Every structure is written in C-alpha cells, then in structure tokens.
C-alpha cells in the first residue's frame, strides 16, 4: 500500500534550471511551497541562502500553482548567476481547495505535504522553508545534522511555555507543553515521515469538521499534533521570527543577532512591501540587490487590508502625506467592498 497521499500526477509540469557543478547525490535539497503572491519573496529567499552559503552544493525546489514567462526568466537567471539548480513544479491544486484556509493562509500552505510525498523515494532529507524567510548565515549545521531513530523532523519552537500550554489544551495534545513549533522551517526526515504516513494522516485530520473547529493555525497545528515527541527542537537561530508590524508598537525588541541564520518575517507586512522599510528588512533587501529582482520595485498596497497597514507604517515612518493618501485610498476601497 502506498504511503503517499499525493502521487506525482498532482505535478503538471516541471522546469529544471540546472547550472550546478555538483552531482545530485551531493546536493542539500531546500523546498518552498507558494502561490503567485510569494514568488517575489521566494526568489529573493533563494538568493539569500546562496549569498550566505557560497560554494555549498544546494538544490532548490519551488512548488507553485502559478509561474509566468517573467518568473521563468528570473528564476533561470538566478540559477545561472549562482551556478545552482532550481526546479519549479507546477501543481494541480484541486484536491487542496476543499481544505480550510484563512485570509493569511491559502491552500498553498498544504504544498509542504506534496513536497514530502514527492521526495519520498528520492532523498533522505529536505529542508522546507517559508518564502518570507531570509538567510544571513551558514546552514552547514543543518547539512551535517543526523536524525535520531524516532525523529521525523527538526523544528524550532514558537513562543514559550505559556503558549505551548495553551496549544496543548486547545489541541487536546498534552505533549505540546514540551514545545510547539512554527512550521515555516522544517527539516524533514523523509523516510520516517513516509513510514509514519504523516501527509495522509494530516490531510485526513484537516477534513474532520470537529478538528477544524479546534485548530487556528491549520496544518501547523496538525503537524504539531502528529510530531509531538517525534521532532527535534533546534536553536531559534534557524527560525528567528519577527513581524514588521511589531514596528508599530511603542517599544520594539529586535530578536535578530549575529548568530541568526534565518530571519522569518511573519505577519501580513513583508519586506517586499513598499511600507516595510525598517532596518530588520536589510537581510531581504541585500539579497534582492544581489539577484535578478534587483531592479524590481517593492510592491505597493492593493487590498484594503494592505492599504490600512501601509497608512499606519507611513505615519510611523513620519511620511505623513503618504499616510494620509493611503488612508483615503483605504476608505474608498472599503466603500467598494
């Protein structure tokens, strides 16, 4: 019986931009699962990993449901620029659209299950990263990591004991008091993930109406349930989370330091947004300037949600005229909704 939930038929097309000098056997595989709104971020995220890890044998895998000719040109140029391999997989999303989604999480969040299943007979380990992550340090420690017998993944804890306790109660999983992780960074032990049938179990749970009522973080909650006591918690430097909307608070503590490897820009405001100009965005912007996206403008607000945040950030940055204009645009947009 197949241990995969997703067979390879969900992949409609594969584009392989291979300019690497290394053999496939030597490569450390890094994967992203995104929709069209994160292609910009994904390209720059890949550039940041390559910029911080020159000479390493890496291969990047982008699973998406949208990829136009402009994207093709830029991603191929990126692979060529850094003499690396980038493989793009066009996904048929029909089976995912019935699963729960929110304003901030679309069905693309479930691509990580397709990723794990795709690699089930191809490699032992895959590093899954969210596309809003920028790299600023060496990933050699992850390349060298050896899993213990029962470890399905390596992850980074989110929050502290109080948050873990709340999640353990909400999700009826007492073991979560020992740690609840953010699913934006997962180093997957592919053979054990496959043997434990994680993708299939997770998708089935996400179809259960009773479970859907309890969960607030979709597949992240479900993965925490299935990986309890079966995941290795690694240092927070591998998933240092910061929301650019924290900059709107009176007091801001920036957790990024010299040891940080991955900066994870959580929340709705991203460093590729024109209103996200803060010092902590520098890791994204540096990679952008060293990529085929170097001449691309940062994205302006489109939705009412974005216009409201753009207005707040413009006032926070003392760009008052822009702030007023964004508020006017926000109220006009709200009238049309």
UniProtKB/Swiss-Prot annotation:
Cofactor: Mg(2+)
Co-factor remark: Can also use Ca(2+) or Mn(2+), with lower efficiency.
InterPro entries on file: Glyco_trans_8, Glyco_transf_8N, Glycosyltrans_8_dom-fam, Nucleotide-diphossugar_trans
Recorded phenotype for the gene knockout or disruption: The mutant has no detectable galactosyltransferase I activity. Mutant synthesizes truncated outer core region, does not express the O antigen and cannot invade epithelial cells. LPS contains one galactose and one glucose unit.
Disulfide topology: none
pH dependence, entry free text: Optimum pH is 8.5-9.0.
Entry binding sites for UDP: 33-38, 130-131, 264-270
DXD 1, short sequence motif: residues: 130-132
Entry's EC annotation: 2.4.1.44
Pathway given in the UniProt record: Bacterial outer membrane biogenesis; LPS core biosynthesis
Keyword Magnesium: yes
GO molecular function: lipopolysaccharide 3-alpha-galactosyltransferase activity; metal ion binding
Keywords: Glycosyltransferase, Lipopolysaccharide biosynthesis, Magnesium, Metal-binding, Transferase
Regulation: Inhibited in a competitive manner by closely related nonsubstrate lipopolysaccharides.
Record motif DXD 2, residues: 219-221
Metal-binding among keywords: yes
GO terms, biological process: lipopolysaccharide core region biosynthetic process
Reactions catalysed, as given in the entry: UDP-alpha-D-galactose + [lipopolysaccharide] = UDP + 3-alpha-D-galactosyl-[lipopolysaccharide]
Binding-site positions, Mg(2+): 130, 132, 264
Known function: Galactosyltransferase involved in the biosynthesis of the core oligosaccharide region of lipopolysaccharide (LPS). Catalyzes the addition of an alpha l,3-linked galactose (galactose I) to the first outer-core glucose (glucose I). Cannot use UDP-glucose. Activity probably does not require the branched galactose added by WaaB, but it is higher in the presence of this branched galactose.
Protein family per UniProt: Belongs to the glycosyltransferase 8 family.
Protein name in the entry: Lipopolysaccharide 1,3-galactosyltransferase
